[in-house]
């Protein structure tokens, strides 16, 4: 009998082996079929069906059977039809991931197919070309009967609309992620509810375009619901969520919801996390509702309009770990019911940007798990409780802009993990407690605008993590500790407006080159730019920690009302260095510092802003400062400096300099940017001369001591002069000879003899009425037409107001970061465009006028000409030629504007024209002009479809920090900003080249630079193209171009190479715009298009207003990374 049972068992084992082997063979066969169906064969190179399923790339096996397969991130470029016919059929696979694998096609291709019986988790996320309706999703879930987790986030679900019926739907799913798709209609969501989506435990519909919340039925099993980032408006309908009593997480943030706190939520007694932030809710919080939500661990109501006091029932929630009520209008005191439980788990308390009063209650000290405490921008008074030192886990203590008094408690030294101590804008007194030296993790110390005194402690130099030190606007005295140079992480040092004396320690530069990568990471900040010329405040501006605060609410700061903060910029304190890391901001102004400026400060390779003004500094300006290659702002005004301005400063790309009120002498260097600044920046230096100051008088009397040496030099000088005159004569003869051979250019493209524009050294007659008259006045508008080639008629303010119908919205044809643009027809019939600039309260009349005179002289066929400008009070208006077809963005992405498509010939002409205009700014103007915001909306199209670059001078109208601190505003537009701008405040011509590369991609692909529908939330056009260039490269081109003329494919590829070169991550490897033009010319030279087209294209390149390609190749010196 035993032998019989043994024989039967052996038969079963053998049968199992046979079945397993057959199943494995079936899996291998399906994988081989899939491999053959994948267009990108290189992605699965090295495997064939004979290798077995377990050796397939991304395979996971258990006991010899294929149980999981992950091809996430592999650029398959496969059709979903092939996936459904092969990978979904794998019999033993439990987990299948094709996340970000470039799968495309329709989800409906799975219709009729059956999934493998073991499949439990399917991840198809991040495939932007995978499209279908929510009904297709339900059908896929039904086809895979055992499926529990389905992830389709970042695809194109919703692009197709649902039909009728409901089907078995989603009932079997445990988790469904449809976030970041295209679900728009309310009917889609209602269909899903009818199809049983309420039975799904985890449902993520964030980042779609849903506009309403239907009533969820049969949703007792729903535990997680995320509808954030949609377009839901109005109040949450009563009863919409009342059946979902099992909900543990509800996220309705970033919508347009309004009304009072939704009453239904009080019935969701199982809630662990509730997020209603970034909506328009208002009214008081119902205390009785929160009394029922005893399981809440996270509550976020920030960025709403809730008011009244904070209910005790909120503060005393027993399980609460995170409480964020920031940016509302709560009033009253901080509840004393906080952390009543000695075992409180609260680790985040955000109450900033409200109207809270009273003191900091002792109850806060009971929150022993607290990691982050932010009470900034309130009206909290009293002293900082010494008991806060009991919060041993605290990392962030942020109390700026309150009414706190008294001394900084020494007990804070017990918080040895403290990283951010931010107490600006209070009334604190005393000195910095020496005990704080124990807080060795401090990263950001900000004590500005208090009444602190005493010396700056030398022990600060021992804080190896210290990155930001702000002690400005206090009464600190004594010398600057040389030990600060030992702070190897220090990037921001602001000591302005104190009573410091002694010399500037050369040791401050010791940390240069010793910094690590990623020193300060992740803290939101706002930088308030201060216009010192008309302000009661001092220094270049104020850096504030800015977590969960509305920018508009900064107007409540008394200091902002006193100071003339011209602009504010929001960003994140994340800074990395490629090499030679150093300080980036140094402000020691308004002190009593004396002695010479140490030349070692020039060793700070990344230093961008240096303000040493309003001190007692003496000696000469060290030429070594010019070794700080990234220096953008330099203020040495109101000192006792003498000697000349170093010629080495000509190599700096300065955007702001102030050397006024010193004892400097000599000539202002003409090279570089120094001569482009207004004379106010050099005034009150009795020995200084040269533009923009009066010219140097070389015949002025000399002292007797100098007479003999000058006599000895006379012979040599006369010889040099004769040589120079002869050389000048030869140059003139050559120029005349060349000029006689060149055909006349159009009048509007008149050039200087050497094709180079130099800033004006003289001022033509102008119309000097200052435009301060009211509308009823008869005085002429102050329009400066110096060197403008086609003077406008005499215009009054009333003329422009009448031409734009009072700047009526109906006349507005555009809007951007610099202001609104209006179409206007003047009385003589001429149609112009009038740009009404945003108010620039920090821009003086002289600076504005000088800049306008410079911009007005720049004429080129591919630049939009400035016809005139005017100013009245704070108003600034610019008058331009009107461009009939608007911008390239309008023409390319909104074709109804001109009612026609752009074929490749037109796009090529636009690409070359825009490049020519930008090359002219970079290489034909001295100093060169950096556009700073090159994008398709700044490429205008005239009636001949000729590209004209606009706004090329706008960034210079703003102050340096406008163009060097805010990559999110003036220094670029999302999608066009080069990667280095996120690490450096400094704009360069190579940044413009990158932005031009994006414009060229737009012309080639027909796609905008950013579109989450096409590229996903974390991608853009550049990233999308770079992904596709690894696959079938021609897929990136606009299908309309190849459909119209397949023969242009090779030419498109050549232009794509140019675009990719412009988009190199390393600026030094990008071509100059002159090189780009040369590459265009090479393409034309080798083009196989017909002679007529070729001739036209060649003309479009060579006929630049000033012969950009014919000029000697004066390649700009490469910027060092």
Swiss-Prot record:
Name all Protein kinase domain ranges: 807-1083
Identify the catalytic residues.
933 (proton acceptor)
**What topology does the record note for this protein and the membrane?**
Single-pass type I membrane protein
Indicate which residues are glycosylated according to the record: 102, 151, 218, 251, 275, 280, 307, 366, 381, 473, 501, 564, 580, 658, 665, 684
Does the keyword Glycoprotein feature in the UniProt annotation? yes
| Inducers of expression | Down-regulated by brassinolide.
Report the enzyme's class at the first EC level. Answer: transferase
Listed GO CC annotations: plasma membrane
State where the protein is found.
Cell membrane
LRR repeats (start-end): 90-114, 116-142, 144-167, 170-193, 197-221, 223-243, 244-268, 269-292, 294-317, 318-341, 343-367, 369-391, 392-415, 416-439, 441-463, 464-487, 489-511, 541-564, 580-603, 604-628, 629-651, 652-676
What practical uses are noted? Over-expression of a truncated form of BRI1 induces partial suppression of endogenous BRI1 expression, leading to an erect leaf phenotype. The estimated grain yield of the transformants is about 30 per cent higher than that of wild type at high density planting.
Q: Where is this motif: Cys pair 1?
A: 54-61
| Function, in words | Receptor kinase involved brassinosteroid (BR) signal transduction. Regulates, in response to BR binding, a signaling cascade involved in plant development, promotion of cell elongation and flowering. Activates BR signaling by targeting and phosphorylating BSK3, a positive regulator of BR signaling. Forms at the plasma membrane a receptor complex with BAK1 which is activated in response to brassinolide. Phosphorylates BAK1. Phosphorylates REM4.1, which reduces REM4.1 binding affinity to BAK1 and allows the formation and subsequent activation of the BRI1-BAK1 receptor complex.
From the Swiss-Prot or TrEMBL record, give the protein name: Brassinosteroid LRR receptor kinase BRI1
Organism per entry: Oryza sativa subsp. japonica
């Amino acid at each position: 009998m035993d032998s019989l049972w043994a024989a039967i068992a052996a038969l079963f084992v053998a049968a199992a082996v046979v079945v397993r082997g057959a199943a494995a063979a079936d899996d291998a066969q399906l994988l081989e079929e899939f491999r053959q169906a994948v267009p990108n064969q290189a992605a699965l190179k090295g495997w064939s069906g004979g290798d077995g399923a377990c050796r397939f790339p991304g395979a996971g096996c258990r006991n010899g059977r294929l149980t999981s397969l992950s091809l996430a991130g592999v650029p398959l470029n496969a059709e979903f039809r092939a996936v459904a016919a092969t990978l979904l059929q794998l019999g033993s696979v439990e987990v299948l991931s094709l996340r970000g694998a470039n799968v495309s096609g329709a989800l409906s291709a799975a219709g009729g197919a059956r999934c493998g019986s073991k499949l439990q988790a399917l991840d198809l996320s991040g495939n932007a070309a995978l499209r279908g309706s929510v009904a297709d999703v339900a059908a896929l879930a039904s086809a895979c009967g055992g499926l529990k987790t389905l992830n389709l986030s970042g695809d194109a679900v919703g692009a197709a609309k649902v039909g009728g019926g409901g089907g078995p739907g989603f009932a079997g799913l445990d988790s469904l992620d449809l976030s970041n798709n295209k679900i728009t209609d309310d009917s889609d969501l209602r269909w899903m509810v009818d199809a049983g989506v309420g039975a799904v435990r985890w449902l993520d519909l964030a980042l779609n375009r849903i506009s309403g919340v239907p009533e969820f039925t049969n949703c007792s099993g729903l535990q997680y619901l995320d509808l954030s980032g949609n377009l839901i408006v109005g109040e949450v309908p009563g009863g919409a969520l009342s059946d979902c009593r099992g909900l543990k997480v509800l996220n309705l943030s970033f919508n347009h919801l309004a009304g009072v706190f939704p009453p239904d939520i009080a019935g969701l007694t199982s809630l662990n996390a509730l997020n209603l932030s970034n909506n328009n809710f208002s009214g008081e919080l119902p205390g009785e509702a929160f009394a029922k939500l005893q399981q809440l661990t996270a509550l976020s109501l920030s960025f709403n309009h809730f008011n009244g006091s904070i209910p005790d029932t909120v503060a005393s929630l027993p399980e609460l770990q995170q409480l964020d009520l920031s940016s509302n209008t709560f009033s009253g005191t901080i509840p004393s019911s906080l952390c009543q439980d000695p075992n409180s788990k609260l680790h985040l308390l955000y109450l900033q940007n409200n109207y809270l009063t009273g003191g900091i209650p002792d109850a806060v000290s009971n929150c022993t798990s607290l990691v982050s405490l932010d009470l900034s921008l309130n009206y909290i008074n009293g002293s900082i409780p010494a008991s806060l030192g009991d919060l041993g886990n605290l990392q962030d203590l942020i109390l700026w802009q309150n009414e706190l008094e008294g001394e900084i408690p020494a007990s804070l030294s017990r918080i040895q993990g403290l990283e951010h101590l931010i107490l600006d804008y209070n009334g604190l007194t005393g000195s910095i407690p020496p005990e704080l030296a124990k807080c060795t993790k401090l990263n950001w110390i900000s004590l500005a605008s208090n009444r602190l005194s005493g010396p700056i402690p030398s022990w600060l130099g021992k804080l190896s993590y210290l990155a930001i030190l702000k002690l400005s606007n206090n009464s600190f005295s004594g010398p600057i500790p040389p030990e600060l140079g030992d702070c190897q992480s220090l990037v921001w040092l602001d000591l302005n407006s104190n009573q410091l004396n002694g010399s500037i320690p050369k040791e401050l530069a010791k940390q240069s080159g010793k910094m690590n990568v990623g020193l300060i990471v992740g803290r939101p900040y706002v930088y308030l730019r201060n216009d010192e010329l008309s302000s009661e405040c001092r220094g270049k501006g104020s850096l504030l920690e800015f977590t969960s605060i509305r920018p508009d609410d900064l107007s409540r700061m008394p200091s902002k009302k006193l100071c003339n903060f011209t602009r504010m910029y929001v960003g994140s304190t994340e800074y990395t260095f490629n090499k030679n890391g150093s300080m980036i901001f140094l402000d020691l102004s308004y002190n009593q510092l004396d002695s010479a400026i140490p030349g070692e400060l020039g060793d700070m390779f990344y230093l961008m802003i240096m303000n040493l003004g309003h001190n007692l500094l003496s000696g000469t300006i060290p030429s070594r400062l010019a070794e700080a290659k990234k220096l953008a702002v330099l203020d040495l005004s109101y000192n006792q400096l003498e000697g000349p301005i170093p010629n080495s400063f000509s190599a700096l790309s300065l955007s702001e300099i102030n050397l006024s009120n010193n004892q400097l002498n000599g000539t202002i260097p003409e090279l570089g940017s120094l001569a482009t600044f207004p004379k106010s920046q050099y005034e009150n230096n009795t020995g200084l001369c040269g533009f923009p100051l009066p010219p140097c008088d070389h015949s002025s009397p000399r002292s007797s001591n100098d007479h003999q040496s000058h006599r000895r030099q006379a012979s040599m000088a006369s010889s040099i002069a004769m040589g120079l005159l002869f050389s000048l004569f030869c140059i003139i003869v050559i120029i005349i000879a060349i000029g006689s051979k060149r055909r006349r250019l159009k009048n509007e493209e008149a050039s200087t003899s050497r094709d180079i524009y130099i800033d004006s050294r003289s001022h033509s007659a102008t119309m000097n009425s200052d435009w301060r008259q009211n509308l009823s006045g008869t005085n002429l508008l102050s329009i400066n037409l110096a060197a403008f080639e086609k003077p406008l008629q005499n215009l009054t303010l009333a003329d422009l107001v009448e031409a734009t119908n009072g700047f009526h919205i109906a006349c507005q044809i555009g809007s951007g970061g610099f202001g609104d643009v209006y179409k206007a027809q003047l009385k003589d019939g001429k149609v112009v465009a009038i740009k009404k600039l945003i108010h620039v309260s920090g821009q003086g009349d002289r600076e504005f006028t000088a800049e306008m005179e410079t911009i007005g002289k720049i004429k080129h066929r591919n630049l939009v000409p400035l016809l005139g400008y005017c100013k009245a009070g704070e108003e600034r208006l610019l008058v331009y030629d009107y461009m009939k077809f608007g911008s390239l963005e309008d023409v390319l992405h909104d074709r109804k504007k001109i009612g026609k498509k752009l074929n490749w010939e037109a796009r090529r002409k636009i690409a070359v024209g825009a490049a020519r205009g930008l090359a002219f700014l970079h290489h034909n103007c001295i100093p060169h002009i950096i556009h700073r915001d090159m994008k398709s909306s700044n490429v205008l199209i005239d009636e001949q479809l000729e590209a004209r670059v606009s706004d090329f001078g706008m960034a210079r109208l703003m102050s340096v920090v406008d163009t060097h601190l805010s990559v999110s505003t003036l220094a670029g537009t999302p999608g066009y900003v080069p990667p280095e701008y996120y690490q450096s405040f400094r704009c360069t011509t190579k940044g413009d080249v990158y932005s031009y590369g994006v414009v060229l991609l737009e012309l080639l692909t027909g796609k905008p630079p950013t579109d989450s529908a096409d590229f996903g939330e974390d991608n853009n056009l550049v990233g999308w193209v770079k992904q596709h260039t690894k696959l079938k490269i021609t897929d990136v081109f606009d299908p309309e171009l190849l459909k119209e003329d397949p023969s242009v494919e090779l030419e498109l590829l050549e232009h794509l190479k140019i675009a990719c070169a412009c988009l190199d991550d390393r600026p030094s490897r990008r071509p100059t715009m002159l090189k780009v033009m040369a590459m265009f010319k090479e393409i034309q030279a080798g083009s196989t298009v017909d002679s007529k087209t070729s001739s036209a294209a060649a003309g479009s390149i060579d006929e630049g207003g000033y012969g950009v390609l014919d000029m000697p190749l004066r390649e700009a010196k490469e910027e060092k990374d």
